[in-house]
Curated annotation (Swiss-Prot):
Described function: Removes 5-oxoproline from various penultimate amino acid residues except L-proline.
Lineage: Bacteria, Bacillati, Bacillota, Clostridia, Thermoanaerobacterales
HAMAP family in alphabetical order: Pyrrolid_peptidase
GO molecular function, a single term: pyroglutamyl-peptidase activity
Root EC class: hydrolase
Catalytic function, reaction form: Release of an N-terminal pyroglutamyl group from a polypeptide, the second amino acid generally not being Pro
Record's subunit section: Homotetramer.
This protein's name: Pyrrolidone-carboxylate peptidase 1
Predominant localisation class: cytoplasm
SUPFAM superfamilies from the UniProt entry: Pyrrolidone carboxyl peptidase (pyroglutamate aminopeptidase) (SSF53182)
Family: Belongs to the peptidase C15 family.
Length: 203
């Protein structure tokens, strides 16, 4: 079994992106599944292109994308990706789509096909905060989640896919008073726990 895990590069003036730091620290094999790691740029269109290229190359059984959601307190397992880009800031390639459909011919939304409730409960059993999120936003994270699910749907592929948002790292909030954060080791544990649930669900 192969699980493709994607993460983003830093954006919005940050020097690190916790998703990529987590990605680098994931085990290469979890519950017998090979973990394939891919960094994608925080860029609307290129992020999906890079992910699809890798999906074609490795034919994974599941794709789990991770992204930073600065300001969130917990591990947020996304339920749904919506068919709209509405960027409050430009992406890393200077693109700033406002109220633009991701795919004008696509459905309004896609639901994650990974077991979101089971993932949340498993992370909580590790004594880490987690919840189901009903909005992945309208920036690059939502765009990537929608783009991957759209590609899988259109090509009738038997691949599960979903997205998890994670908080800031401690070093990112030194100048951001009263902003939540989580340690790297806890976030790695949470994502590895999520992957274990995904693997077991497909076994």
């Amino acid at each position: 079994m192969k699980i493709l895990v994607t993460a983003f590069d830093p954006f919005g003036g940050e020097s690190v992106n916790p998703s990529y730091e987590v990605l680098k620290n994931l085990k290469d094999n979890i519950e017998g599944a090979e973990i394939i790691k891919l960094q994608v740029p925080t860029a609307f269109y290129v992020s999906v292109e890079k992910a699809i290229e890798k999906i074609k190359e490795v034919n994974p059984d599941a794709v789990l994308s991770i992204g930073q959601a600065g300001g969130r307190y917990d591990i947020s397992v996304e339920r749904v990706a919506i068919n709209i880009d509405d960027a409050r800031i430009p992406d890393n390639m200077g693109q700033q789509p406002i109220d633009i459909p991701i795919d004008p011919e696509g459905p309004p939304a896609y639901f994650a096909t990974i077991p979101i409730k089971e993932i949340v409960e498993a992370i909580k059993k590790e004594n880490l905060p987690a919840s189901v999120s009903n909005s992945a936003g309208t920036y690059v994270c939502n765009h990537l989640m929608y783009g991957i699910l759209n590609y899988i749907h259109k090509n009738k592929l038997n691949i599960k896919a979903g997205f998890i948002h994670i908080p800031y790292l401690p070093e990112q909030v030194l100048e951001k008073p009263n902003t939540p954060y989580m340690s790297l080791s806890d976030m790695v544990k949470a994502i590895e726990t999520a992957i274990k649930v995904i693997v077991k669900a497909m076994a």
